[in-house]
Design a protein with these regions (language model features):
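Amphipathic, non-transmembrane alpha-helical scaffold segments
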Residues: 15, 23, 69, 73, ...
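Hydrophobic alpha-helical connector segments
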Residues: 67, 82-116, 169-176
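Helix-turn-helix
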Residues: 21, 25, 29-71
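Amphipathic alpha-helical segments used for helix-helix packing
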Residues: 112-134
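Hydrophobic alpha-helical segments that form the core
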Residues: 117-118, 122-123, 167-186, 202-206
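Amphipathic alpha-helical packing segments from all-alpha helical-bundle domains
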Residues: 77-78, 96-103, 116, 132-159, ...
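Amphipathic C-terminal alpha-helical segment
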Residues: 108, 112, 176-194, 208-215
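N-terminal intrinsically disordered/low-complexity leader segments
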Residues: 1-17, 158, 213-215
């Protein structure tokens, strides 16, 4: 993420430039060393701001953590909606729409030269004891967002293309979500940038085979 020049003790009119800079630094740090390894002092030093500037925007580390997940979730919603909207513009059939949707993420991950930096949801969940119930609730809400939206698409697919084996639609939606999240984690652990796209290809193959016409 791009970091802007520190404004020092002089705040922008809305403070958004400095606030976003602090959040960008903090998010990269959380993805790198985890929430427990991210201290206010380290964020201040990396962002090049004063303590007074930091606490002008965030009262506590918890306040910063909550703001990070709120921004991350909002971007996630837009990312999902933009990708699905594009898929729906390219095809009328729900099955093709879902295959294109997954394909857009395959295209994105296939361009990675380094493993995906990680998922903020996962980073927080691994240290759930260090964050509030409200933050965990926000993460759970986003998991339900993905599940519900994907399940709606799978419902539409099933109505036109009976699956070749018995399924619970929400479980297929969860499988998609699990593959998306797990592929990025595995790619980072194995230090193999191409692994994420490979797993998403397998996921797309599964969906295609699941709803293929019976000979």
């Amino acid at each position: 993420m791009l970091l802007q020049t520190d404004q020092g003790s002089v705040m922008p009119r809305d403070g958004s430039v400095t606030r976003n800079k602090i959040m960008d630094v903090a998010q990269n740090m959380v993805l790198d060393v985890g929430l427990s390894g991210t201290s206010v002092e380290k964020v201040i030093g990396e962002a090049g701001v004063t303590k007074s500037t930091f606490f002008y925007h965030f009262k506590t580390k918890h306040d910063l953590a909550a703001s990070l997940i709120e921004r991350y979730a909002e971007n996630d919603r837009h990312h999902y909606s933009d990708a699905m909207e594009k898929a729906e513009q390219l095809a009328r059939d729900p099955l093709q729409q879902l295959l294109i949707f997954v394909g857009l993420f395959i295209e994105m991950t296939d361009k990675l030269e380094e493993p995906f930096p990680g998922c903020l949801y996962a980073s927080y969940c691994y240290q759930s004891g260090a964050i509030s119930a409200d933050i965990m609730s926000n993460i759970k809400e986003m998991m339900h967002f993905w599940r519900q939206r994907l399940c709606e698409k799978i419902d539409a697919i099933v109505a036109l293309n009976p699956p070749r084996i018995p399924i619970e639609n929400y479980q297929v939606a969860d499988h998609l979500l699990t593959t998306f999240e797990g592929a990025f984690i595995l790619s980072k652990v194995m230090n193999e940038p191409g692994l994420a796209s490979q797993q998403l290809i397998q996921c797309r193959n599964y969906i295609e085979l699941l709803f293929a016409p019976v000979p």
